[in-house]
Amino acid sequence: MQLFRSIIDTPIGDMLALTSDEGLCALEFTTVEGPNRGQERLTRLNARLARWFPPHEIVDRETPALARTRGWLAAYFAGTSADIGDLALDMRGAPFEKRVWTALTSIPPGQTTSYGAIARALESAGASRAVGAANGANPVAIIVPCHRVIGSTGSLTGYGGGLDRKTWLIDHERRWRNEPQAALF
């Protein structure tokens, strides 16, 4: 199996995008603040790819799915229409992870929710930590908006791209959401 790779420049840092023949399967920041954090993310991504896409070869080649991802991100960062339905996603994971990722896509731009609220929405009231783990395993940053999940006290909690980026993304969405002429989503 071949996976196709491209680096996408964004206002908050370069992102590594990987697609399969089915669609986008990974979107990660290439740099993360903190000692060894970048290497940790790369190690985790490689383990995930080995588990869900065996065997695979990574090829540097632009594909229609990568072009659509690049266009989606450009629209998102410009504050114009960016609909997840415009993208084919190939997000492989455990059944509970997939349920959480689907729930994440229902959080409106500029709004946040807690791990506990997602657990309750999934009728798994005691599963806040499991929701957190699934959120952390989200392979498609920004597009599947794990950055919109916060702690039960309203505090910003972990984000694979770093808390500075999480803050930036939430603020970006709130700015565009409050502008009447903009249509972020």
Which residue ranges define each predicted feature?
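…primarily DNA-binding HTH/wHTH and HhH modules…
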Residues: 152-185
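Regulatory, non-catalytic segments
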Residues: 127-138
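Basic nucleic-acid-binding alpha-helical/helix-turn surface characteristic of O6-alkylguanine DNA
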Residues: 1-125, 172-185
